[in-house]
Amino acid sequence: MEDKPLVVSKQKTEVVCGVPTQVVCTAFSSHILVVVTQFGKMGTLVSLEPSNVANDISKPVLTTRVLLGQDEPLIHVFAKNLVAFVSQEAGNRAVLLAMAVKDKSMERLKALKEVIRLCQVW
């Protein structure tokens, strides 16, 4: 029998919009942990849980909940746009996102998504 590690993790450091950025993705059995930092700390911790909509089971809606840090509407929108693809590609698993970024612009969002793709563990 092949020994598969219980936890799979990948890490990448890239310059995003002129700022050194570290991304770490770790796959657990039921969750994917994504850490995105430009400050060397975890920052705001957001849980993204898929929940099925009654009329369309194929496209679950992600429910966001801030567990630690600023609970502002922009945090929810940014988190959902940043890692929704992770949940979908991982078979609708829950995602735990820790993020500490300088700003939440659309340009930075797109660049961060590409770095997250480089750390694919799902």
From Swiss-Prot:
GO biological process: chaperone-mediated protein complex assembly; proteasome assembly
Cysteine-cysteine disulfides: none
Key word Nucleotidyltransferase present: no
Name this protein carries in UniProt: Proteasome assembly chaperone 3
Keywords: Acetylation, Chaperone
One annotated Gene Ontology cellular component of this protein: protein-containing complex
A Pfam family hit: PAC3
Species per Swiss-Prot/TrEMBL record: Mus musculus (Mouse)
GO molecular function: molecular adaptor activity; protein-containing complex binding
